[in-house]
C-alpha cells in the first residue's frame, strides 16, 4: 500500500481543552499464570474465560490464534471493537508458515521480522504530572530501540507475506490523562487507532489488523514488534520483546498508559511466564497491588499476555475524547474514543 502523505505532519491533540481531535485521518487501517511478587492477579472482580485461552502458561510456539474473537461487548479473551466493518486493508496478504490453521495457533519463535535497524536519534517521549492530569507528549518514534526498514523492501524475506508500503513519520501526540483514573459506568470499546502509549514512546493499537484478524499473528512486524499504518503512524499491537526483556522474572513493571489513564503492566512470575486470559477480566485487567504514582497501592490496571488480545480488550475507565470532538472524526462508534476507523495492524 502506498503511504498517505497528507497526514505525515498531522498534529493529534487528544484530551486537551478545546483541542481539535483529528483522529479519523490518523488511524486508518494498517498496511500493513503464577502470581508475581506484587501479590498476584486474582481479584473479586475478575471474570473467567473459557475461550480463547490455554489452561496454563502460554507456549510461545503455539499461541492461540485470536481470529474471530471480536465482540461489540466486553468479553474475556476478546477485543471489544468500535469497528465492526473491515475494509480488508491489512498489509499481510499471505499466511506465513508460523501460523498453523489446523491447530489454530501461531509461533512467535519462528515468525520472521521485517529487516533493518533504523535509528531515530531525535525521538521524544515525556510524562509529567500537572495537577490532576498526567500529560504525555511524544512524537511516536522509538526512543530506545531501532525500527525495521519501511516500506518493506521487495528484497526482504518479509515481503513475501506482507507488502507494507508505509513509512515511519514524526507525529505530535499531546495527551492529558487522569492521574487517578476512575471506573466508567460501563466499559467502552477500543478504536482502530491509538489505545495508549508504551514507554518506548510508541503508540499502542488494539489486537486487530485492518481485516479484523489477530494482528500479532498475521502482520509481519520489525524486531521490536512495530510497523506503520497508512497515516505513517508507527505502533505496536502488544508488548514487544524489547520491552518484555527489560522486566526481570518475579517482578511487575509499568510499561505504558491506556487512553483512560490506567496503567499497562508486565507481570512476570518467578520462572518468567506471563498471566493468561483466565487471570484477567473482560477488559484484560485486574486489581492488585502495584507501583503507581510513586507508591505501592491496590489499583486496577491492564496486564500484558502472550495471547490475544495482548493488552487492552476494552476501556475500564473513560478514555480521553470519549465525548466527541470538534475535529472531523468526533467520537468513535459506540461511545468509544475518537477515531473509529478501520484498525491498522
Where are these regions (language model features)?
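Extracellular/lumenal glycan-associated surfaces
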Residues: 171-177, 198-202, 229-243, 295-309
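Solvent-exposed N-terminal domain segments of exported/luminal and surface proteins
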Residues: 37-213
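Disordered, low-complexity segments in secreted/periplasmic proteins that are enriched in proline
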Residues: 324-345
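N-terminal secretory signal peptides that target proteins for export/translocation
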Residues: 1-13
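Short helix-loop boundary/capping segments
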Residues: 212-222, 230-276
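Cleavable N-terminal signal peptides
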Residues: 33-35
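Sec-dependent signal peptide hydrophobic core
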Residues: 14-25
Amino acid at each position: 500500500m502506498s503511504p498517505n502523505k497528507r497526514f505525515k505532519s498531522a498534529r493529534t491533540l487528544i484530551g486537551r481543552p478545546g483541542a481539535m481531535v483529528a483522529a479519523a485521518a490518523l488511524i486508518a487501517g494498517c498496511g500493513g499464570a503464577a502470581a508475581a511478587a506484587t501479590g498476584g492477579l486474582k481479584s473479586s472482580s475478575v471474570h473467567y474465560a473459557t475461550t480463547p485461552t490455554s489452561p496454563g502458561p502460554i507456549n510461545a510456539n503455539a499461541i492461540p490464534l485470536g481470529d474471530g474473537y471480536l465482540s461489540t461487548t466486553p468479553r474475556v479473551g476478546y477485543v471489544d471493537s468500535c469497528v465492526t466493518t473491515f475494509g480488508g486493508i491489512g498489509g499481510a496478504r499471505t499466511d506465513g508458515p508460523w501460523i498453523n490453521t489446523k491447530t489454530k495457533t501461531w509461533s512467535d519463535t519462528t515468525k520472521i521480522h521485517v529487516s533493518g535497524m533504523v535509528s531515530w536519534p531525535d525521538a521524544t517521549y515525556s510524562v509529567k504530572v500537572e495537577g490532576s492530569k498526567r500529560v504525555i507528549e511524544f512524537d511516536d518514534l522509538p526512543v530506545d530501540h531501532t525500527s525495521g526498514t519501511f516500506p518493506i523492501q521487495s528484497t526482504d524475506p518479509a515481503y513475501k507475506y506482507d507488502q507494507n508500503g508505509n513509512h515511519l513519520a514524526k507525529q505530535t501526540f499531546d495527551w492529558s490523562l487522569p492521574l487517578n483514573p476512575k471506573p466508567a459506568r460501563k466499559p467502552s470499546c477500543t478504536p482502530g487507532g491509538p489505545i495508549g502509549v508504551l514507554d518506548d514512546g510508541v503508540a499502542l493499537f488494539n489486537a486487530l489488523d485492518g481485516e479484523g484478524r489477530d494482528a500479532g499473528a498475521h502482520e509481519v512486524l520489525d524486531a521490536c514488534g512495530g510497523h506503520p499504518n497508512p497515516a505513517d503512524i508507527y505502533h505496536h499491537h502488544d508488548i514487544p520483546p524489547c520491552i518484555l526483556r527489560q522486566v526481570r522474572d518475579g517482578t511487575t513493571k509499568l510499561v505504558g498508559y491506556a487512553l483512560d489513564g490506567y496503567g499497562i503492566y508486565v507481570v512476570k512470575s518467578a520462572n518468567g511466564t506471563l498471566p493468561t486470559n483466565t487471570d484477567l477480566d473482560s477488559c484484560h485487567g485486574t486489581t492488585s497491588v502495584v507501583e503507581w504514582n510513586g507508591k505501592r497501592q491496590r489499583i486496577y490496571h491492564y496486564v500484558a499476555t502472550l495471547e490475544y488480545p495482548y493488552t487492552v480488550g476494552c476501556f475500564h475507565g473513560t478514555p480521553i475524547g470519549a465525548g466527541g470532538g470538534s475535529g472531523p472524526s468526533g467520537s468513535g462508534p459506540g461511545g468509544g474514543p475518537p477515531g473509529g476507523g478501520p484498525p491498522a495492524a
